[in-house]
UniProtKB/Swiss-Prot annotation:
Species this chain originates from: Halothermothrix orenii (strain H 168 / OCM 544 / DSM 9562)
Leading EC class: ligase
InterPro entries xrefs: aa-tRNA-synt_IIb, aa-tRNA-synth_II, aa-tRNA-synth_II/BPL/LPL, Anticodon-bd, Anticodon-bd_dom_sf, Pro-tRNA-ligase_IIa, Pro-tRNA-synth_IIa_bac-type, Pro-tRNA-Synthase_IIa_type1
Gene this protein is translated from: proS
Record protein name field: Proline--tRNA ligase
Quaternary data: Homodimer.
Keyword Transcription regulation part of the UniProt annotation: no
Length: 568
């Protein structure tokens, strides 16, 4: 492709709306343009990267035995009501009615549609196992689209669905997809780590996320510094070490704490450590009041709480509603004396001796609080967020936390959808059984952003060779006929050798060409000038390493191929 013909509107300045590097560089390099919040158009260079990633995905998925299909973006409400997710998916789902008043949504995911697709076709155990995948647009009404392609309202996703006779078969399908995903990301030239994850609204049994480690990532990953344990913080656990109760238990006492609502204020006012505090977090769980308790030096993990409660909606109680639901006040709510409120506590709360909690009276707290003696809870369980320095649940190592970008997610759905939607098969004995399912997703457009977050410098993008829009860029410098002639010859020779090449034939200064080449991140840059031609060489630079080479004009194709073989 000649750059004089290429639609590539680069920008010199960083757009104000772009917060993260990938968004900044995709706008500056002319890969994308914004239509409205969270909705983007892909320009030629950006779309070539998309097609490269899709090509890798298709090849690996086909090699794994999966078959490609294409399902609609518009879904009927009936299917989602069958699965029970029409309401549970919440405001992320964009719903609408047609002119006849029938309800539809724009598909945020395709479990319901794929289950409907196979339930009338799979009749016998002989039809299983089966794995179907698609690469399709998804739509989710994100409350705050941000970070460019990392959190957008419309995005391209590869989603696959496995269908097996039993859980043993699902385990095999899951491992095949786990391996396939690892291979996809390796072929894309990315460093990705698989971590245990929460299943969320997808439901099901086990789940793993594939994360690109990056400071701009919205997800926090907890991992052990000694073993291979890694999990999304939403799912992560730490070893529970029971505290020794060697302190004399004191009588309960109510004390005045004027205006002291926060943990750090109470620590200072009462001269007590935060681990003595019982932090109470008030929610309405599907309209029912729930009080969650964690130690004052811990943070509540809402995902763990939601999973235990198994509710559709968990809403923090606003200040003015405390008297109505808790007969208490914001900042002073506590578990003692509460009626008609479900109390759930982290297991570390049970070990507190002579602690502090709200007295359900404005400007007052209880001291010398002892769980079990002073209040009862429905359940003690792990509902705290892990933090750095916690002990690994599997070894003697300690937990570290880093940010990451989720680029893939796999789930063992089990029979969640097949049972609710009647997707069954007949086994060898003629008995009807629910199909056991798995779901596997890769965020194609998000993968583009993650690749840039992991591969860039102060000058621009550094594309991994496998997903670069072009492999080589030729920069003819100067106006001599011999320079342009040799650049044209090399351009045509590279094309004849199936090497994807850009020829910067624009009438621009050398500095502009160099800057644009670095910005768009083509792996190998070839510079042709009169001085180098006088020496019989072409100057080559590898974008990723910055290393320079001189290659012979006569053996240019052979030398370029050799250089490309060593480019990552």
């Amino acid at each position: 492709m000649r750059m004089s013909n290429l639609y590539i509107p680069t920008l010199k300045e960083v757009p104000k709306e772009a917060e993260v590097v990938s968004h900044q560089l995709m706008l500056r390099a002319g890969l994308i343009r914004n239509l409205t919040a969270g909705v983007y158009s892909f320009l030629p260079l950006g779309y070539r990267v998309i097609k490269k990633i899709e090509g890798i995905i298709r090849k690996v998925m086909d090699e794994s035995g999966a078959q490609e299909v294409l399902m609609p973006v518009i879904h009927t409400s009936d299917l989602w009501k069958e699965s029970g997710r029409w309401e549970k998916f919440g405001p992320l789902m964009i719903k609408f009615e047609d002119r006849k008043g029938r309800e539809y949504c724009l598909g945020p995911t395709h479990e319901e549609v794929i289950t409907d697709l196979v339930r009338d076709e799979i009749r016998s155990y002989k039809d299983l196992p089966l794995n179907l995948y698609q690469i399709q647009t998804k739509v989710r009404d994100e409350i705050r689209p941000r970070f460019g392609l990392m959190r957008s309202r419309e995005f391209i996703m590869k989603d696959a669905y496995s269908f097996d006779r039993d859980y043993e078969g699902l385990d095999k399908s899951y491992q095949v997809m786990y391996g396939a995903y690892t291979e996809v990301f390796n072929r894309c030239g990315l460093e990705v780590r698989a971590v245990e994850a929460d299943t969320g609204a997808m439901g099901g049994k086990d789940s793993h996320e594939f994360m690109v480690l990056a400071e701009s990532g919205e997800d926090d990953i907890a991992f052990c510094n000694r073993c291979d344990y890694a999990a999304n913080v939403e799912r992560a656990e730490a070893r529970y070490v029971k505290s020794e109760k060697n302190e004399e238990i004191k009588p309960l006492e109510k004390v005045e704490t004027p205006g002291k609502k926060k943990i750090d204020e109470l620590v200072e006012f009462l001269k007590m450590p935060s681990e003595k505090m019982i932090k109470a977090v008030a929610y309405l769980a599907d309209g029912e009041p729930v009080l969650a308790l964690v130690r004052g030096d811990d943070e509540l993990n809402e995902v763990k709480l939601i999973n235990y409660l198994d509710v559709i909606e968990l809403t923090p109680v606003v200040d003015e509603d405390f008297p109505q639901y808790y007969n208490s006040y914001a900042g002073y709510v506590g578990p003692i004396g509460l009626k008609n409120v479900r109390i759930i506590a982290d297991r570390k709360v049970k070990d507190i001796v002579n602690g502090i909690c709200g007295a359900n009276e404005e400007n007052y707290h209880f001291i010398n609080v002892n769980p079990e003696r002073d209040f009862s809870v429905e359940k003690y369980l792990d509902i705290r967020k892990v933090k750095e320095g916690d002990q690994c649940p599997h070894c003697e190592g300690t937990i570290e936390i880093k940010s990451g970008i989720e680029v893939g997610h796999i789930f063992k759905l089990g029979t969640k959808y097949s049972e609710s939607m009647g997707a069954t098969y007949l086994d060898e004995n003629g008995k009807e059984q629910p199909i056991v399912m798995g779901s596997y997703g890769i965020g194609v457009t998000r993968l583009v952003a993650a690749a840039i977050e992991q591969n860039h410098d102060e000058h621009g993008i550094i594309w991994p060779k496998a997903i670069a829009p072009y492999q080589v860029i030729i920069l003819p410098l100067g106006k001599g006929d011999e320079v342009n002639k040799r650049a044209e010859e090399l351009y045509l020779e590279l094309k004849d050798n199936n090497i994807e090449v850009l020829l910067d034939d624009r009438n621009e200064r050398a500095g502009v060409k160099f800057n644009d080449a670095d910005l768009i991140g083509i792996p190998l840059r070839l510079t042709i000038g009169s001085r180098s031609l006088d020496k019989g060489v072409i100057e080559a630079r590898v974008r990723g390493t910055g290393q320079d080479y001189e290659i012979s004009v006569e053996d240019a194709i052979k030398d370029i191929k050799k250089l490309l073989e060593n480019v990552k």
